[in-house]
Amino acid sequence: MWSRSSLRRLTATVSTVPESPSLQGARLYLCTDARRERGDLADFADAALAGGVDIIQLRDKGSPGEKAFGPLEARAEIDALHVLAEAARRHNALVAVNDRADIARASGAEVLHLGQDDLPLTVARQIVGDRVIGRSTHDLAQAEAAIAEDVDYFCVGPCWPTPTKPGRAAPGLDLVREVAALNTTKPWFAIGGIDAQRLPDVLDAGARRVVVVRAITAAEDPRAAAEQLAGMLDSAV
């Protein structure tokens, strides 16, 4: 059986006009830091995207690179996003910016992701125009608000506690079940502590799209890790 990532690569070899990357078709969303302490962002991104990642977001907050070198300044963030964009073009994927509407516009990224306490949506929309905007949600009321407001997708979680968001309580899979029961047509992603071992439980709860971090960023073979997750998501469709 062909995996989604294999079909995407096959299509790229036989078509002279690549299909535009699509939020609607996106199922595997990766958040990565700039990997400054490793210096391998380009190779890592290429491997993860080749494995089937559909959206790759740069989020450097709390990263080893931040601890070693300090916060990622705007110019450096834009440079890192350009590295991701180059890889994303090769693999027909989308690039996302965390929090910063100005950085999204300056870098040309297709996606801006906002938390509950970030820039107001109306202001963000004025800055980024018709780019894709996503929203983090942590309870049912926030998810229902995201369905109603002018965002293009939303994330639901954390499903499990995660070091990416220290101190944040995890509403768990009950929230995933509640959101799945809403039967919204707006794309949404489960997030928080998800890996290949936990993904079946997330799928059983009703999610069909997920955001991962360490499941790929900490993997010895990022491409293989992405392929495994993408294959599991494909099988659940």
From Swiss-Prot:
Similarity comment: Belongs to the thiamine-phosphate synthase family.
Magnesium listed as a keyword: yes
SUPFAM superfamilies with a match to the protein in the record: Thiamin phosphate synthase
Catalytic activity: 2-[(2R,5Z)-2-carboxy-4-methylthiazol-5(2H)-ylidene]ethyl phosphate + 4-amino-2-methyl-5-(diphosphooxymethyl)pyrimidine + 2 H(+) = thiamine phosphate + CO2 + diphosphate; 2-(2-carboxy-4-methylthiazol-5-yl)ethyl phosphate + 4-amino-2-methyl-5-(diphosphooxymethyl)pyrimidine + 2 H(+) = thiamine phosphate + CO2 + diphosphate; 4-methyl-5-(2-phosphooxyethyl)-thiazole + 4-amino-2-methyl-5-(diphosphooxymethyl)pyrimidine + H(+) = thiamine phosphate + diphosphate
Entry function: Condenses 4-methyl-5-(beta-hydroxyethyl)thiazole monophosphate (THZ-P) and 2-methyl-4-amino-5-hydroxymethyl pyrimidine pyrophosphate (HMP-PP) to form thiamine monophosphate (TMP).
Chain sites annotated for binding 2-[(2R,5Z)-2-carboxy-4-methylthiazol-5(2H)-ylidene]ethyl phosphate: 162-164, 193
EC number, as in UniProt: 2.5.1.3
Record organism: Mycolicibacterium gilvum (strain PYR-GCK) (Mycobacterium gilvum (strain PYR-GCK))
Gene Ontology BP term (one): thiamine biosynthetic process
The protein's required cofactors: Mg(2+)
Positions contributing to 4-amino-2-methyl-5-(diphosphooxymethyl)pyrimidine binding: 57-61, 98, 136, 165
EC category name: transferase
Residues where Mg(2+) binds: 99, 118
Keywords on record: Magnesium, Metal-binding, Thiamine biosynthesis, Transferase
UniProt gene name: thiE
GO CC terms: cytoplasm
Designated name of the protein: Thiamine-phosphate synthase
